[in-house]
Regions:
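HEAT/armadillo-like alpha-solenoid scaffolds in large eukaryotic assembly and transport factors
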Residues: 57-70, 106-116, 148-160, 177
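Eukaryotic helix-linker segments that join adjacent hydrophobic helices
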Residues: 49-53, 59-61, 71, 95, ...
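Core helices of alpha-solenoid repeat scaffolds
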Residues: 10, 69-80, 112-121, 135, ...
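Residue-level signature of alpha-solenoid helical repeat scaffolds
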Residues: 48, 97-98, 140-144, 164, ...
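Helix-loop junctions that connect tandem helical modules in alpha-solenoid scaffolds
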Residues: 19-38, 79-88, 105-107, 121-131, ...
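N-terminal alpha-helical scaffolding segments that mark the starts
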Residues: 1-59, 65-69
Length: 178
């Protein structure tokens, strides 16, 4: 069940990046050829994770749940990282949704305590995307990390970074704001 939810999210990410790199008109003017290459990289990386997820669910019943579900976190987070670097709100929003699910399913071995700093870095990298849905995803992801019994940050510096990220995401950014 969990891997099917992840498969769906990675499929959506691949679809969004494919649309972004193949679109025409004003969007393609804004989404330059260099960014179109980024879109292809995101799509390829997401499809690579999809293949790994499908293979992990089709393994034999003799493997343990942890081995069955444990795919290298670098590989799992590669399309997420590329999407966050693109700064496109729809890609960033989908990527943060994937991060939320990975963190939420940490009990099943999808995300480990070592990945908290990676997640924090991703959240800080997309903080400047001023789309309201992205800001909401940042807040939700911080909450999921703080509530996770397995991933709850152990040191004060990480907790402070997460809480300050929440406050910055909640700060209104209008014309009068600097």
């Amino acid at each position: 069940m969990a891997s099917s939810m992840l498969e769906h999210d990675y499929r959506q990410l691949a679809l969004l990046s494919r649309k972004a790199s193949a679109s025409s008109g004003l969007t393609s003017f804004i989404w330059s050829s260099n960014n179109a290459k980024e879109g292809e990289e995101i799509k390829d990386s997401a499809e690579r994770v999809l293949l790994l997820l499908r293979n992990s669910t089709s393994t034999t019943a003799t493997t343990t749940t942890t081995n069955e579900r444990r795919i290298d976190s670098e590989t799992m987070l590669a399309p997420v990282r590329l999407s966050c670097q693109s700064r496109r709100p729809e890609l960033v929003g989908q990527a943060l949704g994937i991060v939320q699910k990975l963190v939420g399913m940490s009990e099943e071995g999808w995300c480990t305590a070592a990945d908290v700093h990676t997640v924090l870095g991703l959240l800080q990298s997309v903080e400047a995307v001023y789309d309201e849905s992205v800001q909401l995803k940042i807040l939700q992801t911080c909450l999921v990390v703080l509530q996770s019994p397995r991933l709850h940050p152990r040191n004060a510096e990480t907790i402070l970074s997460l809480v300050s990220l929440c406050f910055r995401a909640m700060t209104p950014r209008g014309k009068g704001q600097v």
